[in-house]
Amino acid sequence: MLPAAPGKGLGSPDPAPCGPAPPGNTKDIIMIYEEDAEEWALYLTEVFLHVVKREAILLYRLENFSFRHLELLNLTSYKCKLLILSNSLLRDLTPKKCQFLEKILHSPKSVVTLLCGVKSSDQLYELLNISQSRWEISTEQEPEDYISVIQSIIFKDSEDYFEVNIPTDLRAKHSGEISERKEIEELSEASRNTIPLAVVLPTEIPCENPGEIFIILRDEVIGDTVEVEFTSSNKRIRTRPALWNKKVWCMKALEFPAGSVHVNVYCDGIVKATTKIKYYPTAKAKECLFRMADSGESLCQNSIEELDGVLTSIFKHEIPYYEFQSLQTEICSQNKYTHFKELPTLLHCAAKFGLKNLAIHLLQCSGATWASKMKNMEGSDPAHIAERHGHKELKKIFEDFSIQEIDINNEQENDYEEDIASFSTYIPSTQNPAFHHESRKTYGQSADGAEANEMEGEGKQNGSGMETKHSPLEVGSESSEDQYDDLYVFIPGADPENNSQEPLMSSRPPLPPPRPVANAFQLERPHFTLPGTMVEGQMERSQNWGHPGVRQETGDEPKGEKEKKEEEKEQEEEEDPYTFAEIDDSEYDMILANLSIKKKTGSRSFIINRPPAPTPRPTSIPPKEETTPYIAQVFQQKTARRQSDDDKFCGLPKKQDRARIESPAFSTLRGCLTDGQEELILLQEKVKNGKMSMDEALEKFKHWQMGKSGLEMIQQEKLRQLRDCIIGKRPEEENVYNKLTIVHHPGGKETAHNENKFYNVHFSNKLPARPQVEKEFGFCCKKDH
């Protein structure tokens, strides 16, 4: 019996008929029990907390059952139903309780029956019209068994389960099988108790040249130091054996006189096991050898066959997934223990002693290929060891296994070569470097004239170098390594010049994601800097109209470029947003001009560190319309302004005039365009360098605009005060205001801007309003005309 949970004695308060229902989908375990099994329910709750949370467990006392609980608590939705079957539950069963249990326990694969004080669950399932549960545990098992059963039910998605429906007439037979299985388990437990704690092999040792002995322990040794004490009638010796594995220890046998010797195994100074061995004189050993030779070595052969069968059975049932590993080299030094050098693996041991069945089983384990080829300190593999010890049949098994492995490897190599050949037919780039040279030139047509020519010159030289480098591929070499190297070199996103000039080194970091070559070239050479400086890209763009790749936009391309033009059109259907950074006059690109001009074409850091691309831009730039020269516009505006000055004071300006003043033509001429652009560029540079956030830059630019507009309003106010002062001092001149208007508006740009500010400024109370001035001095604009 398992001990009851600590602190859960009989004096504990009675819990509720059922615990709180787990919230949401955390419904893993429901335990159904009667009052006499309450302690077991509480104990199992503590055990199952290692697997599930406390909220996922529901304790349901059956004496307070109700059919409404099936819907309110959703009892049938739990993954695992654990029924604690006790005598009280069987005694108090009623038809309603049976019906209630049938609805909860309808799925046998999710039901676990815990036998608590009863021998079998047959009596319960005879009263219920459902199949017997698949899982049945008892109170005599360990907590690990309970956890493993619960895990197999809750996490059943990872395994295949099937439902077994046992007919009524076969339940007796099934219960008999369960009882037989229990008897077998009891017998195995009893036989385990009869196994001695330690066994020394061989049990009989010759007095002269005793050789090695092996000490086999039933249980693993947890302590740090293990000592073996040999005691005879007149001699006692204690020594430390060598570790073979967790349960087997090896040492050289000590020389004792003929007779019995007691062996005590100490672990950290405490006796763990006791056994006895026997020493016999040399004459008796010779008699035994002659007797074995006369009987045809039947005794030795029978013992070897029995050992072979026992070891094979142990490996098949106890260690089904054995894997060859050099564990002994990690535990002990090979220089100190020579048997590791002679028999490095169990396969060598089976070859030496002729354990045929064990060798066949080991050859099916993981790592058997290298274990069969591994040589000991004498340079012998398992096949040679079996031949040296006269095991011809075992030697043939090893040789057949080696031949089979060679055939499998050859088939894999042939399949690999066929895959490479079929792969190379679909990708001609692996065999024709000149094809990549043509595609490189196609990608490079969108670059500017000067650098495109330089790249073509370098590409030809590097292309010839690539042809000489990969010439074995053209001759017909089938080397898979060269082919994969060639594929790696010609990734479209990689830089072909860098790949051809610098060999691929294993110490280099992995390459970035592939990108089109043309896009990389265009992004790494922006043509913009700050205003007021000469940019090389602008000069190159002016020369670029003579290049065939640019001339195709205007329709003047030669006939030899038609095929390339068609290919470019297909490529332009899926253009990268970065492609047009070189032909658009955008402030976004002007920010990174100084950084980008210093970088070379082969550099990758500029592309990686560049911020996200803006909105995709149009594929072509419409030609700019012919505009009137600036000086002509100024004189035209002067003329138009003189004609409209006569109607200044007749009324407020019309909406059409306001619209004309705020038209795009005047907005481009409105002041401080260059200053605003410079201020915006400086702020954007600070944002890109991380010195300022985007919100701070926007706020600063707004303050700058407000400061600019404030200065202009102050100038307008001063100008208006000057006009009023002049008009107030010289009231006799009626046309003085018109003259001042002409004098203070020399250009259309300033006129439009100042008038706009003039009509929008609110006059203060200190100065007289304009209608009062006209009324006071008695002049009107219509008198002159």
UniProtKB/Swiss-Prot annotation:
<feature type="region of interest" description="Interaction with ITPR2">
    <location>
        <begin position="1"/>
        <end position="154"/>
    </location>
</feature>
<keyword id="KW-0040">ANK repeat</keyword>
<dbReference type="GO" id="GO:0043491">
    <property type="term" value="P:phosphatidylinositol 3-kinase/protein kinase B signal transduction"/>
</dbReference>
<comment type="function">
    <text>Involved in B-cell receptor (BCR)-induced Ca(2+) mobilization from intracellular stores. Promotes Lyn-mediated phosphorylation of IP3 receptors 1 and 2.</text>
</comment>
<dbReference type="GO" id="GO:0051898">
    <property type="term" value="P:negative regulation of phosphatidylinositol 3-kinase/protein kinase B signal transduction"/>
</dbReference>
<dbReference type="GO" id="GO:0035591">
    <property type="term" value="F:signaling adaptor activity"/>
</dbReference>
<dbReference type="GO" id="GO:0050731">
    <property type="term" value="P:positive regulation of peptidyl-tyrosine phosphorylation"/>
</dbReference>
<feature type="compositionally biased region" description="Acidic residues">
    <location>
        <begin position="569"/>
        <end position="578"/>
    </location>
</feature>
<dbReference type="GO" id="GO:0005102">
    <property type="term" value="F:signaling receptor binding"/>
</dbReference>
<dbReference type="GO" id="GO:0043274">
    <property type="term" value="F:phospholipase binding"/>
</dbReference>
<feature type="region of interest" description="Disordered">
    <location>
        <begin position="493"/>
        <end position="514"/>
    </location>
</feature>
<feature type="compositionally biased region" description="Basic and acidic residues">
    <location>
        <begin position="553"/>
        <end position="568"/>
    </location>
</feature>
<keyword id="KW-0772">Systemic lupus erythematosus</keyword>
<dbReference type="InterPro" id="IPR052446">
    <property type="entry name" value="B-cell_PI3K-Signaling_Adptrs"/>
</dbReference>
<dbReference type="GO" id="GO:0048471">
    <property type="term" value="C:perinuclear region of cytoplasm"/>
</dbReference>
<keyword id="KW-0597">Phosphoprotein</keyword>
<dbReference type="GO" id="GO:1990782">
    <property type="term" value="F:protein tyrosine kinase binding"/>
</dbReference>
<keyword id="KW-0075">B-cell activation</keyword>
<dbReference type="InterPro" id="IPR017893">
    <property type="entry name" value="DBB_domain"/>
</dbReference>
<protein>
    <recommendedName>
        <fullName>B-cell scaffold protein with ankyrin repeats</fullName>
    </recommendedName>
</protein>
<feature type="region of interest" description="Disordered">
    <location>
        <begin position="606"/>
        <end position="625"/>
    </location>
</feature>
<feature type="repeat" description="ANK 1">
    <location>
        <begin position="342"/>
        <end position="371"/>
    </location>
</feature>
<dbReference type="GO" id="GO:0032715">
    <property type="term" value="P:negative regulation of interleukin-6 production"/>
</dbReference>
<dbReference type="GO" id="GO:0043410">
    <property type="term" value="P:positive regulation of MAPK cascade"/>
</dbReference>
<dbReference type="InterPro" id="IPR035897">
    <property type="entry name" value="Toll_tir_struct_dom_sf"/>
</dbReference>
<feature type="region of interest" description="Disordered">
    <location>
        <begin position="433"/>
        <end position="480"/>
    </location>
</feature>
<dbReference type="GO" id="GO:0050869">
    <property type="term" value="P:negative regulation of B cell activation"/>
</dbReference>
<dbReference type="GO" id="GO:0042113">
    <property type="term" value="P:B cell activation"/>
</dbReference>
<keyword id="KW-0677">Repeat</keyword>
<feature type="domain" description="DBB">
    <location>
        <begin position="200"/>
        <end position="327"/>
    </location>
</feature>
<dbReference type="InterPro" id="IPR000157">
    <property type="entry name" value="TIR_dom"/>
</dbReference>
<dbReference type="GO" id="GO:0000165">
    <property type="term" value="P:MAPK cascade"/>
</dbReference>
<feature type="compositionally biased region" description="Pro residues">
    <location>
        <begin position="611"/>
        <end position="621"/>
    </location>
</feature>
<dbReference type="GO" id="GO:0050853">
    <property type="term" value="P:B cell receptor signaling pathway"/>
</dbReference>
<dbReference type="Pfam" id="PF14545">
    <property type="entry name" value="DBB"/>
</dbReference>
<feature type="domain" description="TIR">
    <location>
        <begin position="25"/>
        <end position="153"/>
    </location>
</feature>
<dbReference type="GO" id="GO:0009617">
    <property type="term" value="P:response to bacterium"/>
</dbReference>
<feature type="repeat" description="ANK 2">
    <location>
        <begin position="378"/>
        <end position="408"/>
    </location>
</feature>
<dbReference type="GO" id="GO:0002020">
    <property type="term" value="F:protease binding"/>
</dbReference>
<dbReference type="InterPro" id="IPR041340">
    <property type="entry name" value="PIK3AP1_TIR"/>
</dbReference>
<comment type="subunit">
    <text>Interacts with LYN, ITPR1 and ITPR2.</text>
</comment>
<dbReference type="InterPro" id="IPR036770">
    <property type="entry name" value="Ankyrin_rpt-contain_sf"/>
</dbReference>
